Each structure stands twice: as C-alpha cells, then as structure tokens.
Amino acid sequence: MKNKVKELRARFGYSQEKLGETVGVTRQTVAAIEKGDYVPSLLLALKICKAFSMKMEDVFWLEEEN
C-alpha cells in the first residue's frame, strides 16, 4: 500500500511525534507507515485522513501488482 502521509505531514507542519499523538500511535508507527513497512488498520487510516481533512483515496492507495 502506498501513501502520502509524509508529504501531507510536511505540508501541515506536523512532526511524526505530533501526528502520532493526534491519531494515538507512536512516532515509530508513523515512520513505518510513511516508509511502507506497516499497513495501518482501517481505523488508524481513517484517523490519519481525518487529521488532514482528506478522503482515504487521496492519502492511501494500493500499489499495482505486476
């Protein structure tokens, strides 16, 4: 799964720690999501989208398989 979390976080002026506090996870979890090492639960993805006032499909999308 791909995402724009890092890009949006920078645009909104959030640190990884601040976004983590906002959505209820650690800074390390935010970093892992940004790197694509961790796929968030639906609830967490919705919280992240709400923090940025964006729709799910504008933040997260499936990577096309070859």
From Swiss-Prot:
The keyword DNA-binding applies. It comes from Bacillus subtilis (strain 168). Residues 16-35 bind DNA. Pfam families: HTH_3. Residues 5-59 form the HTH cro/C1-type domain. The keyword DNA-binding applies. InterPro entries: Cro/C1-type_HTH, Lambda_DNA-bd_dom_sf. GO terms for molecular function: DNA binding. This is Uncharacterized HTH-type transcriptional regulator YgzD. Keywords: DNA-binding, Transcription, Transcription regulation. SMART domains: HTH_XRE. Gene3D superfamilies: lambda repressor-like DNA-binding domains (1.10.260.40).
